[in-house]
């Protein structure tokens, strides 16, 4: 994924009804469609957290999806993004669900 454009990395946490509604599976599918890498997992406090990396415009598309769309049965109350930074190379080769 060497695009010549800056690569971005951002951590996220999604709040709402996001567990037990296939949120991680849909997140993995959407990330692969958009073309970003990283990971997603459930937390013990009922949220979904993870990291996204890729070209800035693709990361922004994924941020929008994580904030507004989600899985069909989910209800997103809010999404927090943190540690957004420019990176020199991707730290992951694909997007995966972590357990």
From Swiss-Prot:
Q: Which residues form the active site?
A: 24, 42
Q: What reaction gets catalysed by this protein?
A: an acyl phosphate + H2O = a carboxylate + phosphate + H(+)
Q: Which residues carry this modification: N-acetylserine?
A: 2
Broadest EC class assigned to this enzyme:
hydrolase
- Report the domain of life of the source organism: Eukaryota
| UniProt GO MF annotations | acylphosphatase activity
* Acylphosphatase-like domain sequence ranges: 9-99
PROSITE patterns under this entry?
A: ACYLPHOSPHATASE_1, ACYLPHOSPHATASE_2, ACYLPHOSPHATASE_3
Phosphoserine PTM positions? 93
Keywords of the record, alphabetical order, are:
Acetylation, Hydrolase, Phosphoprotein
EC number(s)? 3.6.1.7
Protein purpose: Its physiological role is not yet clear.
What family does this belong to?
Belongs to the acylphosphatase family.
Q: What is the protein's name according to its record?
A: Acylphosphatase-2
């Amino acid at each position: 994924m060497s695009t010549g454009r800056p690569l971005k990395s951002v951590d996220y946490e999604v709040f709402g009804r996001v567990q037990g509604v296939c949120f991680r599976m849909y997140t993995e599918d959407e990330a692969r469609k958009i073309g970003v890498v990283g990971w997603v997992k459930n937390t013990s406090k009922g949220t979904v957290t993870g990291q996204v990396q890729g070209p800035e415009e693709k990361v922004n598309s994924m941020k929008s999806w994580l904030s507004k769309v989600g899985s069909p049965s989910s209800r997103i109350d809010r999404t927090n993004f943190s540690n957004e930074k420019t990176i020199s190379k991707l730290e992951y080769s694909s997007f995966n669900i972590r357990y």
